[in-house]
């Protein structure tokens, strides 16, 4: 017999379902993700640290979990909410079920709930604090706890690498600042021959420049960009000296370093099906996204940054480029995992930018 579990929201509403994953119950910010596939990559994305994910697709876990498709070594999210969790995956690569994987990483979950109703609530009211309980009598006590709960504010420090390491390539050298990177960023760079040195999020500009890289990337990551201000001086210290590419949180920090401001979105962009328009070409890409903060477009007016991409659903800023220096960024995930590969050409643009910059430096020093 399936054991009952309750998902409780800070507004006092609750949803009755069935136990999934761990019994180590936790609280977090509840969000929704609209991707139809790629649940393993989503669960292991460090950008979800401290959050509870509601999957809008009704069946999750149908092809199981395998060892190769993780985007980080250890998932850090605080919960998973699904309509139906498959107990008998069908895929030749699968090694564990969704339930087994969540239990292994001490992540609680719930199945058998109305995920459409939960998604509408988040969409209409904005993100909420949420938690789980296995005892219906504890619901009101949990509601009161949620109303005053302080959610973690040091997520980047939690997920960033503690020591530098290298993913070997044979051509250009890239330093990747790890704010909670997805592994596919490293894979995409390695596929293009780059030697990638992954360094902690608080590495200084001086330390980066001493490595003599051909380019610098700022990765995705969790949380509020205003709480990672340690990176702003570093960004200002390398701009113009090395080609620069920022993704997601890295994009936001790039903008903040140049005087722009960010804001918390009502319910964010999370999924593998978000349309983005390139303002330079008019081309539309379907993109993978995962962010709850965005850059205020009006705050860019007095900066040296120009908007290159916008979200078609709400018009928010999705891409920036420095008007004079070799530096650009996107709010979405060109590395995908999960999602379409429409935008992985941006890695090629970064490669071209590094080669052009290197050639220009060679000519100057000749």
From Swiss-Prot:
Keywords: Amino-acid biosynthesis, Arginine biosynthesis, ATP-binding, Glutamine amidotransferase, Ligase, Nucleotide-binding, Pyrimidine biosynthesis. GO terms for biological process: 'de novo' pyrimidine nucleobase biosynthetic process; 'de novo' UMP biosynthetic process; glutamine metabolic process; L-arginine biosynthetic process. Residues 173-360 form the Glutamine amidotransferase type-1 domain. PROSITE patterns: GATASE_TYPE_1 (PS51273). The active site is at residues 248, 333, 335. The keyword ATP-binding applies. L-glutamine binds at residues 47, 221, 223, 249, 252, 290, 292-293. InterPro entries: Anth_synth/Amidotransfase, CarbamoylP_synth_ssu, CarbamoylP_synth_ssu_N, CarbP_synth_ssu_N_sf, Class_I_gatase-like, CPSase_GATase1, GATASE. It catalyses: hydrogencarbonate + L-glutamine + 2 ATP + H2O = carbamoyl phosphate + L-glutamate + 2 ADP + phosphate + 2 H(+). Pathway: Amino-acid biosynthesis; L-arginine biosynthesis; carbamoyl phosphate from bicarbonate: step 1/1; Pyrimidine metabolism; UMP biosynthesis via de novo pathway; (S)-dihydroorotate from bicarbonate: step 1/3. Its EC number is 6.3.5.5. The keyword tRNA-binding does not apply. Composed of two chains; the small (or glutamine) chain promotes the hydrolysis of glutamine to ammonia, which is used by the large (or ammonia) chain to synthesize carbamoyl phosphate. Tetramer of heterodimers (alpha,beta)4. Small subunit of the glutamine-dependent carbamoyl phosphate synthetase (CPSase). CPSase catalyzes the formation of carbamoyl phosphate from the ammonia moiety of glutamine, carbonate, and phosphate donated by ATP, constituting the first step of 2 biosynthetic pathways, one leading to arginine and/or urea and the other to pyrimidine nucleotides. The small subunit (glutamine amidotransferase) binds and cleaves glutamine to supply the large subunit with the substrate ammonia. This is Carbamoyl phosphate synthase small chain.
């Amino acid at each position: 017999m399936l054991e009952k579990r309750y998902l409780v929201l800070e507004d006092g509403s609750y949803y009755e379902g069935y136990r999934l994953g761990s019994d180590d119950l936790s609280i977090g910010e509840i969000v929704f993700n609209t991707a139809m596939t790629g649940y393993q990559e989503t669960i292991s994305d460090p950008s979800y640290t401290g959050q509870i994910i509601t999957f809008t697709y009704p069946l999750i876990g149908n092809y199981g979990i395998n060892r190769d498709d993780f985007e980080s070594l250890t998932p850090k999210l605080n919960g998973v909410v699904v309509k139906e969790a498959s107990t008998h995956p069908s895929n030749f690569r699968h090694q564990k079920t969704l339930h087994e994987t969540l239990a292994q990483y001490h992540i609680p979950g719930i199945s058998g709930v109305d995920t459409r109703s939960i998604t509408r609530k988040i969409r209409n009211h904005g993100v909420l604090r949420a938690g789980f309980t296995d005892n219906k009598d504890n619901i009101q006590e949990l509601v009161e706890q949620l109303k005053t709960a302080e959610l973690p504010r040091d997520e980047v420090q939690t997920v960033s690498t503690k020591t530098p390491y290298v993913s070997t390539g044979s051509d250009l050298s890239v330093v990747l600042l790890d704010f909670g990177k997805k592994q596919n960023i490293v894979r995409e760079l390695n596929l293009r021959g780059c030697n990638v040195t992954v360094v902690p999020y608080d590495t200084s500009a001086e330390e980066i420049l001493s490595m003599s890289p051909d380019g610098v990337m700022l990765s995705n990551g969790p949380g509020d960009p205003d709480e990672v201000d340690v990176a702003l001086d570093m960004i200002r210290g390398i701009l113009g000296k090395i080609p620069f590419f920022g993704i997601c949180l890295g994009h936001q920090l790039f903008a903040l370093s140049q005087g722009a401001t960010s804001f918390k979105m009502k319910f964010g962009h999370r999924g593998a099906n978000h349309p983005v328009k390139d303002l330079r070409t008019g081309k539309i890409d379907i993109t993978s996204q995962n962010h709850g903060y965005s850059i205020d477009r009006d705050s860019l007016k007095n900066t040296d940054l120009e908007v290159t991409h916008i979200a078609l659903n709400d018009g928010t800023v999705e891409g920036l480029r420095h008007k004079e220096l070799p530096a650009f960024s996107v709010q979405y995930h060109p590395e995908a995992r999960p999602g379409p590969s429409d935008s992985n050409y941006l890695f090629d643009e970064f490669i071209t930018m590094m080669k052009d910059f290197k050639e220009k430096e060679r000519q100057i020093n000749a």
